[in-house]
Amino acid sequence: MPTPSRAYTFARAQRDQLRQRYVTLRRCFRNDTRRPRLRALVDALLRGRAAVSMTLATCEMVLRSGRVLTAADVVASEVGSRSGPAFDHALELRLKKFYMARVHLESLLHFDGKAKYAALYVGGEGPDYGACCVLFERGGVRTDSTCFAGDTLTTVFDAEGNPAGLSSAEVLMRFATRQDVHRLGSLAYRDILDDGHPATPLDLQRLQDLLCVRDTLLEVHVHDDLLVEDIQRIIIARKVGRSMAQKLLRYDDASVAERQQMQFDDVRAYLAIHELADKRKIPVVGGTC
C-alpha cells in the first residue's frame, strides 16, 4: 500500500478535534426534524468528486499530455530541476504576488509541492471561474487526499497575497482528510441546515451553488498524479458554449489564411478537446458540439 502523503498524515493527526465539533453539531439535530437534511448533506458530500476548473487551452494540454501539471511541474520541466535557486526564481515569476503566500501555505499544511488543487463537485456546472470543469476520480476517491473549507489562497490571503488575518489555528480548523469531507462540509454549510422550515428537504441546488464559488467551495487536494484515465467527464461552461456558437460559424467560414490571422485559439482548443475526448471515450457536456 502506498505511503500516505505528509499532508494527509498531518490532517489525520488533527481528526479528533474535527470529530468533536461534528458530534456537537449532530447533537443539535438529534431530536429535530432537520436531521434528514443533515443526512442528505452528508450523503451529497461523500458522493462528491474532484473537479478542476481550467481554461480550454489547459484542458487540451491535459488531454494531450495525459495528466494534470502543477505550476511547479511546468517550471521543473523548463529549468530541469525541482529545487534550487533557478527553480525557486522561475516559480516566483510564474506565481507572482502569490508566490510567498503559496510557499507559506504549503509549508503550514505540510504539502510537498506536488499537490493538485481541485474543488468538490456534487452536481451542476461545477466551479464557475474557468472555461471548463474536468471531473476526475473515475476509478474512485483517492484515499490520501485532503480538503479545505474555502479556496486556500483567497481565504487565507487577500487579493495582494498578504495574510487575511486568520491565525494558523483557524486555518487548520478548515483543513481535513478527504474521508472527513462530510464533517468539514457540514460545519461549513451549517446555514443550509438551518434554512427555512425544519421539515423541508435539503436545498441541493443551493449546495451546488456554494460549491461553485471560490469563497464557499470545498477545496480538494490530490497528492498524487491526476491522469487522463481518471477523467470522468468534461463540462464546458454555459457562458463559453453561448459565445462559442458564433465563433464556430466565423471559423467555418474563414479561409486557412484568415484562421491563422484571426484570434481563433479558443476555437481550436475547443474543437481539439472534443476530438481528443472522443478518442478516449470521455463524455463532454455543455457547449455546442
Predicted regions: what is each one?
Residues 106-128:
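Extended catalytic/binding region for NAD+/ADP-ribose chemistry, centered on the ART fold
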Residues 59-63:
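Short N-terminal binding/cap micro-motifs at the start of the first secondary-structure element
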Residues 68-69:
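Intrinsically disordered, low-complexity N-proximal targeting/linker segments that flank membranes
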Residues 2-58, 72-109, 132, 137-289:
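Active-site-proximal loop/hinge segments that shape catalytic or ion-binding/gating pockets
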